[in-house]
Regions:
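Extracellular/virion structural assembly segments
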Residues: 1-215
Length: 215
């Protein structure tokens, strides 16, 4: 069986060996997910007061996940998974159903897109909405793990933010797709602490902060 590289949740089960297993333990669902876009900028001002702005670093998303009160069994599915990846600095994926659009599903990308462009041409844009979050699947490039937001829709062309991180060549073997139904973000644990508490009834209170990473 393959190693489970997605944070365990009701759709991504894990067994005691850390593998994907449909008969394994389901992770708890999220009570809330906060998504933040971080785009550092530099602002310089002239003596006359004019402001000159420039992007100083790459854009990334951060994710703040909160859980409802957890039983010990539920807690012990997700917490060891996160601890192991915090200690090893290993990246993993988190599935974000709250930001998915199951009606849109997956759409084939039908035209090449160069790195730095902000547009993608799809087979159709049926049921896609402005502000939808999506990831892409490029069979010839498994390092394209960035997620994007739709900012405009014009016929079969969507405008996205941030700009496309890696080139997409549709002439290569396989089908390049934009995945709207259950976008997955590649992340690492943010910061040095993963804190939890246990109340008098034995229920666990727990949340975790993650940040997007491309490596």
């Amino acid at each position: 069986m393959a190693v489970q590289n997605t944070l365990p949740d009701p759709n991504n089960k894990i067994n005691a060996a850390g593998e994907i297993d449909s008969n394994g333990s389901a992770g708890p669902g999220f009570s809330s997910v906060s998504l933040t876009s971080q785009q550092p900028i530099t602002v310089n001002r002239s003596n006359s007061g004019l402001a000159f702005r420039s992007i100083s670093k790459f854009q990334k998303f951060s994710v703040d996940i909160k859980y409802n009160k957890l039983t010990k069994a539920e807690f012990n599915v997700v917490y060891p998974y996160l601890m192991e990846r915090q200690a090893s600095l290993e990246a993993f994926f988190v599935e974000l159903p709250q930001y998915g659009n199951t009606s849109a599903g997956s759409k084939e990308i039908t035209a090449d897109a160069s790195a730095g462009t902000n547009q993608l041409t799809l087979a159709n844009t049926t049921n896609i909405n402005v502000a939808d979050l999506f990831s892409v699947t490029v069979p010839s490039d498994d390092t394209h793990v960035k997620v994007y937001k739709v900012t405009k829709i014009n016929n079969n062309v969507i405008t996205v933010s941030p700009q496309i991180q890696r080139p997409i060549d549709v002439s290569n073997s396989g089908t390049e797709t934009a995945n709207f139904s259950t976008p997955k973000m590649r992340v690492i644990v943010s910061g040095p602490d993963i804190q939890y508490s246990v109340d008098v009834t034995g229920l666990y209170s727990f949340s975790v902060k993650l940040e997007e990473t491309l490596s």
